[in-house]
């Protein structure tokens, strides 16, 4: 931990991690480098929700590492796609709700990064792949810089345009 020297009680209740757990871990820089090495050259993130990609980039910017991820970042939001596939869109369901609805075993606690990633993967691999491929998400923490980099996506029910930054 380098920014905050404590974890608020309400956060601790959700994520079940305390300050000592973080102090005993590797640095963010090392973890991010190892993660990106593991991802390889051609990657696309899959998340449960729309905040993880932005938070990763915010932390990478803080540590001077943002250039390692070219934005805008395209990713698959399994929470959004779950809602589409199960006719619950635009409702955003919890990871545990989706696990229960899909009758998947709950062997570990929720709100732990590795466990939640495994649960998200189990849900993701059961989603309708044409629906997945038709519904990528774009994180615009890093906006396009030029007209050539602008993004236009056409979804089944709407279109999305991500324009470049203007001075």
Q: What is each of the regions a protein language model found here?
A:
Residues 41-43, 105-111, 160-163:
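Cysteine endopeptidase catalytic domains of the caspase/legumain-like
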Residues 1-61, 100:
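Conserved non-catalytic scaffold segment of RNase H-like nuclease domains
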Residues 54, 118-121:
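A structural signal for well-ordered alpha-helical segments within the folded catalytic domains
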Residues 65-85:
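Histidine/lysine/aspartate-rich catalytic loop segments that bind and position anionic ligands
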Residues 6-15, 19-22, 81-117:
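Active-site-proximal helix-loop-helix substrate-binding element of RNase H-like nuclease domains
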Residues 122-167:
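Acidic two-metal-ion nuclease catalytic site recognized across multiple nuclease folds
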């Amino acid at each position: 931990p380098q920014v905050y020297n404590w974890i608020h009680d309400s956060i601790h209740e959700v994520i079940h991690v305390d300050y000592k757990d973080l102090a005993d871990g590797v640095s963010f820089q090392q973890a991010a480098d190892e993660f990106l090495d593991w991802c390889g050259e051609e990657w696309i993130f899959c998340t449960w929700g729309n905040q993880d990609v932005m938070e990763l980039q915010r932390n990478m910017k803080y540590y001077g590492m943002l250039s390692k991820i070219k934005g805008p970042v395209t990713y698959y939001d399994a929470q959004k796609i779950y809602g589409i596939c199960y006719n619950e869109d635009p409702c955003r369901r919890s990871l545990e709700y989706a696990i229960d609805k899909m009758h998947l075993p709950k062997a570990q606690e929720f709100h732990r990064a590795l466990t939640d990633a495994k649960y998200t993967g189990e849900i993701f691999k059961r989603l309708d792949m044409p629906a997945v491929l038709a519904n990528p998400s774009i994180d615009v923490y890093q906006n396009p810089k030029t007209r050539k980099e602008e993004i236009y996506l056409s979804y089944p029910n709407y279109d999305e345009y991500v324009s470049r930054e203007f001075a």
